[in-house]
Amino acid sequence: MRGLLLLLAMSQTRTIDFEHDTVGQPPTGFSFGHTREVGAPGRWLVQEEAGGKFLAQLDPDPTRARFPVAVLNDLTATDVDLSVRFRPVSGRVDQAAGLVWRFQDEDNYYLVRANARENNVVLYKVEGGRRTDLPLRGEGRTYGTPAQVPSGRWSTLRVVARRNLFEVYFNGAKLYEVEDSTFTNAGKVGLWTKADSVTDFDDLTVTTKGASEP
């Protein structure tokens, strides 16, 4: 029991809902970049509607290999439970929303993304700026899995990372697991889009896990 209480004490949850940020400005506490510096770096601004504030990536640069990222400055972790609400707004090339973790720099990180144009959810490693989809545990390399990702509506994407095992969830349903050990060091977490995706994000929730978690 003492060990369990210690573990719970070592786990912390925080939710970034952007309610204290200024509309029309980038959110505080984030850094912005783009993989391999291909295309425009992205325009991440806080927006507001009747339901409250949210973060939007608003730059519609259609460069296909363009991957804008927004990462939290003050959180570095190895094992995380990471989720976000997202809403694809527009994009002729892509309508993508992603979560990144163990982010070392703009060219090296893990990524899971949902795409409303492809209707699938795929987990990748980005290593040296090269994006590679990873095989699903027990299924092989299938390019993720099909999922109905609605455009213009809010959905929830989640990944649970424990050591070299990653569990992927979409709208509360578990989709698959992936095992990979490319990045084992702690890194930052954040958000990701692709090409001309204009995407809204809200309620970025991060639970950091105790190092001794089984």
Region spans (language model):
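Short, solvent-exposed beta-strand-to-loop segments that form ligand-recognition rims
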Residues: Y169-G190
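Sec-dependent signal peptide recognition
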Residues: M1-L6
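Extracellular glycan-recognition surfaces and repeat-rich motifs
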Residues: Q25-Q57, P62-R66
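Extracellular carbohydrate-recognition regions
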Residues: S11-T35, E213-P214
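Ligand-recognition surfaces built from glycine- and aromatic
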Residues: T15-D17, F183-P214
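Short, aromatic/His-centered strand-loop micro-motif at the edge of beta-sheets
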Residues: G129-T156
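Secretory/extracellular carbohydrate-interaction modules
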Residues: V23, Q57-R131
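Localized edge beta-strand/strand-to-loop motifs within extracellular or lumenal beta-rich domains
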Residues: R153-E167
